[in-house]
Amino acid sequence: MSVRSLPAALRACARLQPHDPAFTFMDYEQDWDGVAITLTWSQLYRRTLNVAQELSRCGSTGDRVVISAPQGLEYVVAFLGALQAGRIAVPLSVPQGGVTDERSDSVLSDSSPVAILTTSSAVDDVVQHVARRPGESPPSIIEVDLLDLDAPNGYTFKEDEYPSTAYLQYTSGSTRTPAGVVMSHQNVRVNFEQLMSGYFADTDGIPPPNSALVSWLPFYHDMGLVIGICAPILGGYPAVLTSPVSFLQRPARWMHLMASDFHAFSAAPNFAFELAARRTTDDDMAGRDLGNILTILSGSERVQAATIKRFADRFARFNLQERVIRPSYGLAEATVYVATSKPGQPPETVDFDTESLSAGHAKPCAGGGATSLISYMLPRSPIVRIVDSDTCIECPDGTVGEIWVHGDNVANGYWQKPDESERTFGGKIVTPSPGTPEGPWLRTGDSGFVTDGKMFIIGRIKDLLIVYGRNHSPDDIEATIQEITRGRCAAISVPGDRSTEKLVAIIELKKRGDSDQDAMARLGAIKREVTSALSSSHGLSVADLVLVAPGSIPITTSGKVRRGACVEQYRQDQFARLDA
């Protein structure tokens, strides 16, 4: 479907397949086994028009409209209604206190919305939050579910009057204050085409008939928004959705939604694969068949090869093919998708010498002292290069540098942040190689390298730990720890003696044991096992292992560890140690 904008794509779907299912939301709050609520394409379009008509009374073209509602069909309708009205949508979660409120405050201040779209179940929280913001002109608050959404509507908005910007995707803020990535309709459309080309490279970018997208990811997160709302509309595919809470309550629900007659395309971060493998029982899967699954992409956080293997092994008896699991790399500044693994085969893992990798050189090896990394295809579109971030010169094969991205999926910048936009989106390569544009390049802030025509990702440059003069990826250290503890952990470096940095690991555990003595003995055994594993796998001695209860490590709204906050809490001795 060749269209210029999301509203145009929705209009085309409503015209071409009006009575086909568009979005189905599985509500597990009404019933433990789920209640399916479905909108057809014509119903969705009509509801979108009614929201747009209501918004026509608020502000003008290009003004911002925040969507702050629970996960559900009302959120989908609200987001699309904002676009239909020619407003710039701002996806957000419902304020609930703590980090969520800090994020909401930051987004509301930065975007200055003329309206907030919510629901009657969440309006009290939204009103209360907005009321705490004195001195600002309050936005109109609209309860979407109280509108007459199914009323006949002749609302129109000319295609050429839509602003080029579709929505602001605020970053998770794991290393800084959230910034609004300015996403255009073109960015979203192009990235959808790139995504389809990457995942369906062997079928000319076209999935088989009877395909559907399955997602529980939050709509305010880039992967949840694109996979859950934008991709179904741009492709004209049905979507089956539920909430993150429903998944966390019972991970088997995700597996159930994918074990359907249709060909499921789904996505989740690494932790979800771990959770599903550990907490889904054989009884949960009785009578289920995963053989129709098309693709499950793993992205949004570092993909751990051991987790993928556990997930594949766990569900193999239910006909899951390991080749459908596709490790993927992307970021909000590039809409969502940049690269994925090779199609038609299980994810490939390559071992590299840890010592050499710490020094910036990729040296394949076998045996101990290795860091296992997953390989990704170098995409044709967008263009990806590995660049020395200091000299802006392309790195030779096997040399670690910063991942730079160029293409029409890359945003123009951050909302009202010209200096930061120039630093991040205005990269220029010095003496580019043949076929390589000089610029502009998105500087991703991620380190990686290319060897044998494959790309490997190490992690966030800002998160790199420098211990005794060597660079270490916290993701690698955390993966080693999680193989033992299975819970969330954070590897950080803090100042030590003589101007050196020392390694500290914060580890979430449940304090188990028949007695306090048994529990303490178990904690001691875990500390010894972790210490030994870090020494043998990474050549590192850990200065302090801080064992804490689940939920103690500060995270972003998308579940990423806030390492800066961890460092501050550690320095202030604010972690409640289980073995104190």
UniProtKB/Swiss-Prot annotation:
Activity control mechanisms: Inhibited by acylsulfamoyl (acyl-AMS) analogs.
Species of origin: Mycobacterium tuberculosis (strain ATCC 25618 / H37Rv)
Family classification: Belongs to the ATP-dependent AMP-binding enzyme family.
Gene Ontology terms: biological process: biological process involved in interaction with host; DIM/DIP cell wall layer assembly; fatty acid biosynthetic process; lipid biosynthetic process; symbiont-mediated suppression of host innate immune response
Keywords of the record: ATP-binding, Fatty acid metabolism, Ligase, Lipid metabolism, Nucleotide-binding
Residue span of region Disordered: 421-440
Mutant lacking the gene: phenotype: Disruption of fadD28 abolishes the production of phthiocerol dimycocerosate (DIM) on the cell envelope. Grows normally in liquid culture, traffics into host (human and mouse) acidified compartments early after phagocytosis, suggesting it no longer arrests phagosome maturation as well as wild-type, impaired growth in mouse macrophages.
Any one Gene Ontology cellular component term annotated for this protein: plasma membrane
Protein name: Long-chain-fatty-acid--AMP ligase FadD28
This protein's encoding gene: fadD28
EC number from the UniProt entry: 6.2.1.49
